[in-house]
Amino acid sequence: MYEGVRELRENARVTSEFKSDYQELVDEISELLGVPATLENRDFELIAFGAYDSEGDLDPSALDPVRTRSILTRRSTTAVRTWFEGFGITRATGPVRIPPTPEAGVYRGRICLPVRHRGVVLGYVWLLDSDPGPTDAQLAAAMGVAGRIGALLADEAQAGAGLGRELRAVLVAEGGWQRDMAVAELRTALGARADVPHTLVCVAPWPSADPDDAPSPRTVPHATALCALPWGAAGHSLAVLVRLRSTDTATPALTAAARLLRDAEEARSAAARGAGARTAAAVAAGSAGPVPGAQACAAGVGGARTGLAELGAVWQEASAAARAALAEPRFGPVARWADIGPYRLLTALPPQAPQDPAVAPLLTPAHHELARTAEVYLDHAGQAGRTATALGIHRQTLYYRLSRVEQLTGLDLDDGEDRLLLHMALKGARLA
């Protein structure tokens, strides 16, 4: 294994030049073997595929469910990936034949050509097997092309890893000359793309601390670069630089955020399955402990900017929006900075800011119902009728609860400043 293996997975981008090269190489393999070829990265995400070219009728078995889904959605499911990896393709250095298995959705056999570079598997070329299939000489020639694909994937990934490092340097820089230098380096790396409208997406908490588990920007719509950043005391978040068509629309960022949340959910599900298997083994051994619950994640989208100078501020906005989405389900799972209202101010407070002493008694578990009543009352601008309807209670019950809130806190709910203090304290408690 060589030292760059982690970088090969950490971040990658596809320029039009890279994309064209991949397509040409896949077409070359298709011509060599006379069958359509498909190229996927090691995470089973589609990169390129050869068109079906035949003078006869299209064989329906060439479009079995697994192949169709891969082409239409540009990726395979975790179950499909696990099934194919069971044939040893991650360790193989030569062609691997996989028999047809209709119950798995594989109606036609496959030939897998591992795509390697310096001993590291970076992807796979998939061929539909036939009878008679390709000769050994044809497969050897195709493996030569696969080696060229591996070199291209390595170059692409290393270029993308550099972008990820430059982005991270900008987002963690203290400011002043350090920030200026980091921005200049990122601007140089991006070239002409530096001056287009951008925003940042924050996905938090990202379910894995392993950089190898970060997605490739190729698979994230409109993503230019991504990197992992700390989140809270021990967690991690994912920062994604997204290019926009204009500063007036956030649609590309919302699309990217939705895709990343799906990736995060898949990672959480896989982790939960692994934890379940470990727990079952521990139970069998008589040493089972508590099973940690999987933590939900959310995404935040910062405001749009042209150029890179304000990326630090955009990251603060995206992080704040993600925190708001985690605190308030009505914002999530994807929240925009422009839409989070008072949380734009509340998220600027230190994460461990102490509770106001007047409101602290109300925030204990014993008074959860009173706190909820007060929050809904203040959310409805102190209108008793709307509040009672929202809570599904009688007005007299509402008045009784509000009087109890005043007794506990010493605050006067007829006083505007007291209302403001209570409202902000209740909202801030959601961020804790």
Regions found by a protein language model. Name each.
Residues E55-D57, G175, Q352-A353:
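Short, hinge-like loop/turn segments at secondary-structure boundaries
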